[in-house]
């Protein structure tokens, strides 16, 4: 059949500069979750192809490209990095995976981390993650199933490991030393903003 003759290269996006085709992406450039990793997702979600492409505007050339073949529920871009957010599960089993890439010319993948809950926010998901002084700060929400207190909110701080492809948890609120919940009982978060070393909810 026609599908049997289709190769992975046939499915890749095409790019053109001044109406001329450019060979800028190989299937070997595409990254996927390592299913054997302890922090890997357990479901398939809604797989999509997300491309990172470095374009030299002055020279009108494509310097590099990376292909990411997993669900992408949100994107956050800092001055030095770009983060893809991948959410899984629901209720008290919900979690979010955060995948980090450098924004230099090689677009290198540098690591992934996991936090409890989702970065939900009625269209404001990307405001719930922030990079500051080498730390990644994330606000997540999680449904509890309790009608009297239906939501738990968390602030998690991650940091790039110096010797592995991991975004490691540095701290989280609430915790055993600071157990107070982040909001009033049964209260939803409608806005999240990071400014320097302060967080406004």
Regions found by a protein language model. Name each.
Residues 1-201:
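Beta-sheet-rich non-transmembrane sensory/scaffold domains
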């Amino acid at each position: 059949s026609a599908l049997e003759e289709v190769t992975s290269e046939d499915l890749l996006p095409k790019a053109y500069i001044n109406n001329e085709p450019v060979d800028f992406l190989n299937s070997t450039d595409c990254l996927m979750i390592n299913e054997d990793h302890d922090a890997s997702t357990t479901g398939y979600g809604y797989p999509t192809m997300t491309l990172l492409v470095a374009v030299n505007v002055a020279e009108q050339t494509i310097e590099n490209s990376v292909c990411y073949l997993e669900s992408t529920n949100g994107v956050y871009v800092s001055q030095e990095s770009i983060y893809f957010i991948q959410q899984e599960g629901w209720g008290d089993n919900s979690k979010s995976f955060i995948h980090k890439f450098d924004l230099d010319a090689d677009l290198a993948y540098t690591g992934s981390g996991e936090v409890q809950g989702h970065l939900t926010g009625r269209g404001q998901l990307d405001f719930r993650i922030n990079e500051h002084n080498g730390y990644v700060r994330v606000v997540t929400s999680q449904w509890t199933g309790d009608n009297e207190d239906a939501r738990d909110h968390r602030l998690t701080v991650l940091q790039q490991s110096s010797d592995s492809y991991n975004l490691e948890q540095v701290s989280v609120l609430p915790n055993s030393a600071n157990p107070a919940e982040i909001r009033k009982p049964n209260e939803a978060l409608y806005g999240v903003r990071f400014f320097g070393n302060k967080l406004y909810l």
